[in-house]
């Protein structure tokens, strides 16, 4: 019997499993067509108006990248010059403009999560959007909430926010709003259940010596999908995200970019997504089935990098002409792309790209990879940084988590001799950008590695910033940055008034192997002898302060409770202003108010939720079974009664706060009604015509390997170049896939983000918070809910806010709980419902420090 998405999955195959034993993703067709619901109406109508004037080839040109390394951006679509529609520039990354110059390198998404600050998330998004816009990029390939962070050693966790879906969802949405308010389309990625680097792409894994033929499959049940991994994407869609990027992995043994259940049903029918779905680069595996399953844009356009062949382009034109892909589906692709373009106002701000992703030379061939086209200026060296360094410094400081403080901080500036110890204090000897895509761990760590990076315009190291502080006060500072020079470290620490020890742990994307870490971390220990560096300093200095730059939690149990370790700070991946933002906290200019966005366990085993790092299904797709369900991070620790070292939401301050006066009030709200009715029939725009209308234009000078939408012959088989052309469509067209008739509206659907009634506010919760210390500071009240039920987490985060209070100041913090906040996913009804189990609310400063609690009244 095959497992479906609606059933719990618990496979432990060690050899090739039969198809009937593998997790199974049920089909869902046809692909829903956009209709302009929510606040998309105006953009949708403009898109319909322009697409109605396009030929089939022009529509196809919007959907297909022109090929890897050919034009200036990492992804580029064709345009419709006749109608004034330019080709669109798509560019990484979630923390700044990748492969460019004179751009900012922002703190990671994980650092934004550590701020717990919605406004900073928005401001960072807007600042990034401004830089993308100024560089001529139309679509930012970010932000990310996939990976969510199921496993603490997942390689790309730092690109996202937090393993908590509510914290991730709010900051994901605010980032998207900021990017799009700057006139750039934001891309919510990687959709969905993309939680490890191992086996994400079969060719990549084969390059590492793994004998597999298909990408790994994330296997999870329907409740886990909705309550955990889909949750932040619902927030993104409700926030108006223009694009969603489907992921490399399979979900229940169906590829992410042709999975009709996750794309057609969950994203488009249930969440009401009105924008377009693009493939991750080379995650497009089939032409017709991808189109019918809900893919709208193929990136970077070619089947294999620089191959000159494409599943779409000419082949998508052929597929419409021969009837295997209905006209309405391609019309819908084009409308979705143009609606996103218009929704953010890109047409008013459009400027051509003024940089090349492939060279820093000022001049080069227009079509880089094939050295064809005019030899022209490709890099204009436009400085787009504005005053964003100030925001970056602020986020860096506001995301620095104070984990321990035995009165050592803040520093006074009167310390006579400051020792700066550890490689992480200093510079990469090759330069801040000396390793391609930051694929090394040399010097201080300010971002992970992979496509989710950006070039630093500069990098202020801790050594530089702290030395400036010490010298300003006319005291002494000495540095030891060789992590294996233990004797010298011990000697320096002996002489110091305070030893600041810098350690790190890195990770990134799977195409880069750093010290045997294939993207994912091999373990949670500190890198480059970090534990021994700390112990050497602490054994010789009774005022040792540890600063951790890492991509997630690390194991600190060897030294965290050493009395000579007087303070511990986690700085995450703070970006270009790393040293300055840290100095602001160390010297008390900024009172730390950050909270850990993940749990710090005593051992790797405490987390469970293991990565699959060896094939477990013969040479078939490795099976990644999410048997823990919704119990990841603090939820799993709570379930297993596992005591962490530092819990989720934990963080100290230079002041103290008191919580009191919890009040709960029921609000008036409409009753919940499942969505019902039917959609309109699929619209079509314009006439298709016949093959003779789509031959290559006379006089066109074709560029080698460039992906075009036209035909080289009216013989469709000859034009397709597909060896299996002519196969009976009944062999591969799923039932209902080409049906453009009216379709039922799902109960959980009805608007962007799902049923609008889910967002009704049902309960108001208020507490009084007082600063009981002597200095001003920020506090983050956190509201958790117990949903009741025998198989539910003990508590789940639902609301939070970062607030600033002066000494002795108190404030009343109020927030609301929506129907969605109190609901569970009902697998049988395929809808959200508030169960009859008793519910409670908890408020406090971390997931394990919740002094206020109350029973919640019954609501529906």
Curated annotation (Swiss-Prot):
Residues 1-19 form the signal peptide. It comes from Aspergillus kawachii (strain NBRC 4308). The keyword Lipid biosynthesis does not apply. Pathway: Glycan metabolism; cellulose degradation. It comes from the Eukaryota. Beta-glucosidases are one of a number of cellulolytic enzymes involved in the degradation of cellulosic biomass. Catalyzes the last step releasing glucose from the inhibitory cellobiose. This is Beta-glucosidase A. SMART domains: Fn3_like. One of its GO terms (molecular function) is beta-glucosidase activity. It is found in: Secreted. Pfam families: Fn3-like (PF14310), Glyco_hydro_3 (PF00933), Glyco_hydro_3_C (PF01915). Glycans are attached at residues 61, 211, 252, 315, 322, 354, 387, 442, 523, 542, 564, 658, 690, 712. Belongs to the glycosyl hydrolase 3 family.
């Amino acid at each position: 019997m095959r497992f479906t998405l609606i059933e719990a999955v618990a496979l432990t195959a060690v050899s090739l499993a039969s198809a009937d034993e593998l997790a199974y993703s049920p089909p869902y067709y046809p692909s829903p067509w956009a209709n302009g619901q929510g606040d998309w109406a105006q953009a949708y109508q403009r898109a319909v108006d322009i697409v109605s004037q396009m030929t089939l080839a022009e529509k196809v040109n919007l959907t297909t990248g022109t090929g890897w390394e050919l034009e200036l951006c990492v992804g580029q679509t064709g345009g419709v010059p006749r109608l004034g529609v330019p080709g669109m520039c798509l560019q990484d990354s979630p923390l700044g403009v990748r492969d460019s110059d004179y751009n900012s390198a922002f703190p990671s998404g994980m650092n934004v999560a550590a701020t717990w600050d919605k406004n900073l998330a928005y401001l960072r998004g807007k600042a990034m959007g401004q830089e993308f816009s100024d560089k001529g990029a139309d679509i930012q390939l970010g932000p990310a909430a996939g990976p969510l962070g199921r496993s603490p050693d997942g390689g790309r966790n730092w690109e996202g926010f937090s393993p908590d879906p509510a914290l991730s969802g709010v900051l994901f949405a605010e980032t998207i709003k900021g990017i799009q308010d700057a006139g750039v389309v934001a891309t919510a990625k990687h959709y969905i259940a993309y939680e490890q680097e191992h086996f994400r792409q079969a060719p990549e894994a084969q390059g590492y010596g793994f004998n597999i033929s298909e990408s790994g499959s994330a296997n999870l049940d329907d409740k886990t999908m909705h309550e955990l991994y889909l949750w932040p994407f619902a927030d993104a869609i409700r926030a108006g995200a223009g694009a969603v990027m489907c992921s490399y992995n399979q979900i229940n043994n169906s590829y992410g970019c042709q999975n009709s259940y996750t794309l057609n049903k969950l994203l488009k029918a249930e969440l009401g997504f009105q924008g377009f779905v693009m493939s991750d680069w080379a995650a497009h595996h089939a032409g017709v089935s991808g189109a019918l399953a809900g893919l709208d844009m193929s990136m970077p356009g070619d089947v294999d990098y620089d191959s000159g062949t494409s599943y779409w382009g000419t082949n998508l034109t052929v597929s419409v002409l021969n009837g295997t892909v209905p006209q309405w589906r391609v019309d819908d692709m084009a409308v979705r792309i143009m609606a996103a373009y218009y929704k953010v106002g890109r047409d008013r701000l459009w400027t051509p790209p003024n940089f090349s992703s492939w060279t820093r030379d000022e001049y080069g061939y227009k079509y880089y990879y094939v050295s064809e086209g005019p030899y022209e200026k490709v890099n204009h060296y436009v400085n787009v940084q504005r005053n964003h360094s100030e925001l970056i410094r602020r986020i860096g400081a506001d995301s620095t988590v104070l984990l321990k403080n035995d009165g050592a901080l803040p520093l006074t500036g009167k310390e006579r001799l400051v020792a700066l110890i550890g490689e992480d204090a200093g510079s990469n000897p090759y330069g801040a950008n000396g390793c391609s895509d930051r694929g090394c761990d040399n010097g201080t760590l300010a971002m992970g590695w992979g496509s989710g990076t950006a070039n630093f315009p500069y990098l202020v190291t801790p050594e530089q910033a702290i030395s400036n502080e010490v010298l300003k006060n006319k005291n002494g500072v000495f540095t030891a940055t060789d992590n294996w020079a233990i004797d010298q470290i011990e000697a320096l620490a002996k002489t110091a008034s305070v030893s600041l020890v810098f350690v790190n742990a890195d990770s990134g994307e799977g195409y880069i192997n750093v010290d045997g870490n294939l993207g994912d971390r091999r373990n949670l220990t500190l890198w480059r002898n970090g534990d021994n560096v700390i112990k050497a300093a602490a054994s010789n200095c009774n005022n040792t302060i540890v600063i951790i730059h890492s991509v997630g939690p690390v194991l600190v149990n060897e030294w965290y409770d050493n009395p000579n370790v007087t303070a511990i700070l986690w700085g995450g991946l703070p970006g270009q202003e790393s040293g300055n933002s840290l100095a602001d906290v160390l010297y008390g200019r900024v009172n730390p108010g950050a909270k850990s966005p993940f749990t710090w366990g005593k051992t790797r085993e405490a987390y469970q939720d293991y990565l699959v790092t060896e094939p477990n299904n013969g040479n078939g797709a490795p099976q990644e079974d999410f048997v823990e369900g919704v119990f990841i991070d603090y939820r799993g620790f709570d379930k297993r009664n596992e005591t962490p070292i530092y819990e989720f939401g934990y963080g100290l301050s230079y002041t103290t706060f008191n919580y009191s006066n919890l009040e709960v009030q029921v609000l008036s709200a409409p009753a919940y009604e499942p969505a019902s009715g039917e959609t309109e029939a699929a619209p079509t725009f314009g006439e298709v015509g016949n093959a003779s209308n789509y031959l290559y234009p006379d006089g066109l000078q074709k560029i080698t390997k460039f992906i075009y939408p036209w035909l080289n012959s009216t013989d469709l088989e000859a034009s397709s170049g597909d060896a299996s052309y002519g196969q009976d469509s009944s062999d591969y067209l799923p039932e209902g896939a080409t049906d453009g008739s009216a379709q039922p509206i799902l109960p959980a659907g009805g608007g962007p983000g799902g049923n609008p009634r889910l967002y009704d506010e049902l309960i108001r919760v208020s507490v009084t918070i007082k600063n009981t210390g002597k200095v001003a500071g920020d506090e983050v009240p956190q509201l958790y809910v117990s949903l009741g039920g025998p198989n539910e987490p003990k508590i789940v985060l639902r609301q939070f806010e970062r607030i600033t209070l002066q000494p002795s100041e108190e404030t009343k913090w109020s927030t609301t709980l929506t129907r969605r906040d109190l609901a569970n996913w009902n697998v049988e009804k395929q809808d959200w419902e508030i169960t009859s189990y008793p519910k409670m609310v908890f408020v406090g400063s971390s997931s394990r420090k919740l002094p206020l609690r109350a029973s919640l009244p019954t609501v529906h």
